[in-house]
């Protein structure tokens, strides 16, 4: 019944809150507590319910709508199985936790990492992106054939990770007092990018003119790098190049993209290649690393390359 389910939710959110705060390892400026308030035990497609609240304000006195569905018993649910965070009407965030089975009820509360998964989705609610989307597989990297693994974080993998990265902590602290960050921090993700990236190149300790710089972009979902550089630059007589308009390089980048598909219309990581007399050096520029400048009150991210 409803009372028993509310009790189950209360116990579960005790887990979520305990994990959320402990994973901050003393770096949060606030104590965070999510309090479940059971509204309805529904008997319809959870996908249909989700679509209703994408268009209807629904819960003006609440901050997040959590929809739990333990079986894919409606045809429209299978295309949206799994756990994710999305937006609803009036800037309400919705967290959907939907089973992956069409035949058996999945006891989501019985999954030992479910509370960490919900914490991950609530991380999106607070404004943190998926760090795992910055991952590059070596086999999908035609530029230097090296794997890139993002920082350890609940927003990278919640299965076996028990901490927030410094990037996530900064964002969660920054948006902490907002009940609806989508409303109060509109466009925040793009605003975190610095305006510039300053690249400085030295050869044997001396500033080097004419070093070719290639900026190769990576895509979410594919975990790959596009071999054709998105942008190409060259250092000046000071051995420097100032890359400007950085927010628009990463987010909603202008063509040519040299790819037919760019998920979320964003480059998630850039690999900067510097070439001098046939020798090449590489620097990873994932969005979350470059955005750290926002919390340092700087408008330029510094890159130094030594040959």
Q: Where are the predicted features?
A:
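A short beta-turn/strand-edge loop motif at beta-sheet boundaries
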Residues: 204-210
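Hydrophobic beta-strand segments
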Residues: 211-220
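Sec/Tat-exported extracytoplasmic proteins
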Residues: 16, 20-24, 126-130, 159, ...
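The catalytic-center signature of Zn2+-dependent metalloproteases
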Residues: 100-170
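A short, amphipathic beta-strand motif
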Residues: 195-203
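Catalytic cores of secreted or luminal carbohydrate-active enzymes
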Residues: 156-194
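Propeptide-to-catalytic entry region of secreted or membrane-anchored zinc metalloproteases
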Residues: 1-114, 219-306
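Residues that flank catalytic or metal-binding motifs in active/ligand-binding sites
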Residues: 61, 148-151, 195, 209, ...
């Amino acid at each position: 019944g409803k009372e028993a389910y509310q009790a189950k939710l209360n116990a579960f959110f005790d887990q979520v809150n305990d994990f959320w705060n402990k994973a901050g390892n003393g770096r949060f400026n606030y104590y965070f507590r999510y309090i479940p308030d059971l509204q309805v035990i529904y008997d319809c497609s959870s996908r249909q319910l989700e679509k209703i609240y994408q268009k209807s304000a629904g819960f003006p006195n609440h901050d997040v709508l959590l929809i739990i569905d333990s079986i894919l018993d409606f045809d429209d649910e299978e295309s949206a199985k799994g756990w994710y965070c999305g937006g609803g009407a009036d800037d309400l965030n919705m967290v959907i936790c939907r089973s992956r089975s069409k035949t058996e009820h999945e006891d989501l509360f019985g999954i030992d990492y479910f509370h960490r998964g919900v914490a991950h989705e609530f991380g999106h609610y607070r404004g943190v992106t998926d760090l795992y989307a910055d991952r590059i597989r070596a086999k999908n990297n035609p530029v230097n054939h090296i794997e890139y693994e993002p920082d350890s974080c609940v927003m990278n993998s919640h299965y076996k990770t028990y901490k927030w990265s410094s990037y996530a902590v900064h964002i969660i602290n920054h948006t902490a007092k907002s009940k609806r960050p989508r409303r109060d921090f509109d466009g925040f993700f793009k605003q975190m990018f610095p305006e510039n990236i300053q690249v400085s190149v030295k050869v044997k300790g001396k500033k080097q003119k004419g070093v070719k710089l290639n900026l190769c972009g990576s895509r979410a979902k594919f975990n790959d790098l596009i071999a054709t550089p998105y942008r190409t630059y060259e250092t000046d007589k000071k051995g420097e190049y100032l890359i400007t308009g950085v927010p628009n390089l990463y987010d909603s980048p202008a063509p040519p993209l040299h790819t037919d598909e760019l998920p979320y219309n964003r480059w998630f990581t850039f690999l900067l290649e510097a070439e001098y007399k046939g020798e090449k050096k590489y620097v990873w520029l994932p969005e979350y690393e470059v955005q750290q400048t926002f919390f340092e009150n700087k408008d330029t991210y510094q890159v130094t390359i030594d040959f």
